[in-house]
Amino acid sequence: MFDFMTLEKVREKGPLVHNITNIVVANDSANGLLAIGASPIMASAKEEMDELAKMADVLVINIGTLDGELVTAMKIAGRAANVAGTPVVLDPVGVGATSYRRKVVQELLAEIQFAAIRGNAGELAAIAGEAWEAKGVDAGVGSADVLSIAGKVANEWSTVVIISGEVDVISDGTRFAKVANGSALLPRITGSGCLLSAVCGSFIAVQDDAFRASVEACASYAVASEYAEMELERKLPGSFRPLFLDALASWSVEKTRAKAKIQESGEHK
């Protein structure tokens, strides 16, 4: 099912990815999108959200650094994107960390139809209402079944769920996939998950099947990180970061096909 040609579509079409993101990761997210062939715009003024919704091929909302004005812009942008038929991706950074973040995410979910939600296990557990020990914006620890969490959130909100971690889990509520690739250095550079959300958005922008797009995005991203790690003399995050950007720019369909470890299944009980 997965031929990984979505990457080539991104490069051919250069989708415009509108990011309302956090101040920590904006630069890396923009550079990562440029590396894969997408066209990023980082804009958050509420006055221009309606216009941008008509221009963009996808909207990626990231709640990493929140304030009231930004939340207003997110809601305006998301509603306008829905009207325009533009897919919207949510990255609920640290949603389980504070009551304010939980409130904002619930409001966003109630007001906007999302094509995909990408987060770590702790973040998706918080949305699912499952017990999980949050650690700020990090995944933390918990005993709930990750596949069940993915399916529950996907079905409740009619979306594709991407839970990233040592093994990525992707589900649309009916189909499930695991991607068992990725460098151990990814969690050691800030914003690697946020960039993955943006990459998933760029794939969804050019592929009608958001589940397929998300699986191929996760696999391509993870395989690129493995190639970057192979180039390192010393396995340190500061050296890994620029090599990963280079790997994103030079990754190929053939490399992903050769190394991708994907396990797909039907409905999870």
UniProtKB/Swiss-Prot annotation:
Recorded source organism is Listeria monocytogenes serovar 1/2a (strain ATCC BAA-679 / EGD-e)
Locate the residues binding ATP.
Answer: 118, 164
User: Keyword ATP-binding, does the record have it?
Assistant: yes
Q: What is the lineage of its organism?
A: Bacteria, Bacillati, Bacillota, Bacilli, Bacillales
* Role description: Catalyzes the phosphorylation of the hydroxyl group of 4-methyl-5-beta-hydroxyethylthiazole (THZ).
Catalytic class of the enzyme: transferase
One Pfam family here: HK
Which NCBIfam families has this protein been placed in? PRK09355.1, thiM
Which family is annotated?
Answer: Belongs to the Thz kinase family.
State the Gene Ontology terms under molecular function.
Answer: ATP binding; hydroxyethylthiazole kinase activity; magnesium ion binding
What is the official name of this protein in its record? Answer: Hydroxyethylthiazole kinase
